[in-house]
Structure formats: C-alpha cells, structure tokens
C-alpha cells in the first residue's frame, strides 16, 4: 500500500511503491548505457485500413514490429556483461500506464501470432494491468518494448531503453501533415517513430534498417497479417 507523509501546507510526500522502485532502478541502469535515437516519419494511410473491431492501430504497429524484428535480430536483443544475445523469439513489451504506475507486460512469441492474435493478447494484458491482476510471468522475458503516447496527443518523444533490452520504440500521434508525393503536395496521416538503442548492442545502420523494414510494412500492407 502506498504511504503518505504529511509535510504541512507545502504538500505531501508519497513513498514509492515496489513497482515504482523497480522502475527507478531499471531507468537508473539505463542511463549508464550509451544510447542514441533515430526518427522516421511513416505514412499511416495503409495501416489505418487494417483496423477492425477489436484491432487498434497499436495492434497493427505491434504486429509489423514483430515481423520486422524477426528479420532484424540485432534490434531484438539484450546486452549484459559485455555480451549481446540476439533472439529468434520476439517477445514485445508494451508500456501501459495505470493508477499503479507504468507496467510493461509482454506479448510472448509475437512473431508467430496473427494480427487478431496480437490484438487479443494486447487487450488481455492491458486489462490485467488496469485491474491490478498482472502476473510476474506476464512481465518477464521481453526482448523489445513499444511505448505509444499517440493517444495522448504527443507528436514525438524519445523513450529510455528497458535494460537489458537493446532498443525501445516510441510512437507519437498520427496527424494530418502536408507531404510531397511524386511531386504533388498532399495531406497524409503521418506518425513519427523514434527508436532508442543501446550502442553497445547495435549501431545506427542496423537501427536504420529495422526502421526501414517497419516503415515498408506499415506503408504498403493493406490486409490483416
């Protein structure tokens, strides 16, 4: 239970919960890593057509991330004790905010799930977080994390890696922007994706290739996967 300490008219101090203490330790560890971030703008026209009942834009992003990560294991990796471990299994963590703080439940084996399967699993773990019923197994084993603040109206941001993971993807809001398409100015639903990486585990070229693969999938696929 969260405790409150009365400090008079200036306000109150709140002791950190166990979950918050763990997050503080993880974020402190993250700041010891040499991090870099790269950003790409993606046209979400095709991605928006893949939404359906029970399938959100976040689900589409998670599904295409899983496919791109399977092709680029240098991003689907951990760094620990001067060792880089690249994974064939794609276990995507999704940052979820609740009254209890920030939790990162994991969709295990995401590379083997359909879009509908990812949507169902995402809905399940988010509901468990919001209800305070998340289990230890639900937050263990992540190989990559996605943080989406687009629904909060945040255009672009840089996320901090979730150690020992090698990278984290920050997704901003999808908004209409004027872009040039084959020489013509057009209004398109654009979204900024920022990838933060641990330079000890990967490099800018590998990060750019992953984002290019993700961009290609989101911009060209118009059918559920």
Residue ranges and their predicted role:
Residues 1-225:
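C-terminal catalytic/motor cores of large multi-domain enzyme assemblies
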């Amino acid at each position: 239970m969260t405790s409150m300490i009365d400090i008079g008219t200036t306000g109150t101090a709140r002791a950190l919960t166990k979950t918050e203490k763990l997050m503080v330790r993880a974020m402190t560890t993250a700041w010891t890593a040499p991090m870099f971030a790269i950003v790409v703008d993606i046209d979400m026209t095709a991605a928006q057509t893949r939404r359906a009942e029970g399938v959100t834009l976040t689900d589409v992003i998670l599904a295409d991330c899983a496919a791109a990560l399977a092709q680029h294991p240098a991003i689907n990796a951990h760094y620990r004790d001067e060792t880089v471990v690249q994974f064939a299994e794609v276990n995507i963590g999704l940052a979820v905010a609740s009254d209890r703080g920030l939790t990162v439940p994991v969709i295990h084996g995401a590379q083997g799930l359909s879009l509908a399967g990812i949507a169902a699993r995402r809905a399940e773990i988010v509901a468990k977080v919001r209800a305070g019923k998340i289990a230890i197994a639900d937050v263990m084993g992540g190989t990559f994390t996605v943080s989406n603040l687009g629904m909060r109206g945040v255009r672009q941001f840089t996320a901090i890696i979730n150690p020992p993971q090698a990278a984290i993807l920050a997704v901003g809001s999808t908004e209409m922007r004027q872009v040039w398409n084959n020489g013509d100015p057009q209004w398109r639903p654009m979204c900024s994706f920022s990838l933060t990486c641990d330079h000890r585990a990967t490099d800018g070229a590998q990060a750019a290739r992953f984002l290019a693969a993700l961009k290609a999938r989101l911009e060209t696929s118009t059918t559920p996967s």
